[in-house]
Amino acid sequence: MPLIRTPRTLPRVLSPGEVDALAGALRTHRDRAMVAAMLLGGLRRCEVLGLRLEDVNTGERRLFLAEGKGGRQRVVPVSGRFFASLGAYLEHERPATAATTRVFVVLKGARRGAPLSASGVDEIFDGARARAGLVRATCHQLRHTCFTRLREAGMALEAIQAQAGHASIDSTRIYLHLANDWLEKEYLRAAEAIEAQAAGPADGAMQ
């Protein structure tokens, strides 16, 4: 008896307006750097929190991710906007007295200088969502938004797999389904080429 495949729920992708609203609601360079790491680099929340100062290669604009999912390590490029926010955070906000090598730390209160926790990131997102008037905007949605936009821009699926840290390319293929605008443009471009080839020189001419 054949198995019935259960449809997989596609992860939600943030619209450009939602991204702008969320970015505008962030209050610190630290928070902007964390969001940029997820939105522009596709990092998971745990990978952002696991970053250490020695993992940051500013000259080559790369990050070494030592604490990826499943224990897999990788080096990924991230855009200059992330490094600009990161530089501002390290120069102006990160306490010089912080005893940890973790990049992202608590900025205020009794735990000032201690590594930022997952619950701390969630609290930051809750506040930013409320100020932006958004119902949903999660760390994982930022990651999915990153890879969807990269695919729409023409990035090869194998390259996205490497950037995302997926063990199997099957996990990456979901971005073929998410990139609806990209798919439509690719189809229309190909269809127009086929139609042009199929049309004869006298096609549509008066007989």
Predicted regions and their residues:
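Active-site/catalytic core of tyrosine-dependent DNA strand-transfer enzymes
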Residues: 80-134, 200
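Short, basic (Lys/Arg/His-rich) helix/loop patches that form interaction surfaces
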Residues: 76, 122-162
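Catalytic-site neighborhood detector that most strongly recognizes the C-terminal catalytic loop/helix
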Residues: 13, 67, 164, 169-189
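Conserved tyrosine-mediated DNA breakage-rejoining catalytic core shared by Y-recombinases
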Residues: 46, 50-85, 99, 170
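Short, structured motif recognition centered on aromatic/hydrophobic residues
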Residues: 37-39, 86-89, 103-105, 125, ...
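C-terminal secondary-structure termini that scaffold catalytic or DNA-interacting sites
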Residues: 190-207
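Basic, Lys/Arg- and aromatic-enriched nucleic-acid-binding interface segment
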Residues: 7, 12, 16-45, 70-72, ...
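Short pre-functional
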Residues: 32-46, 62-64, 148-149, 191
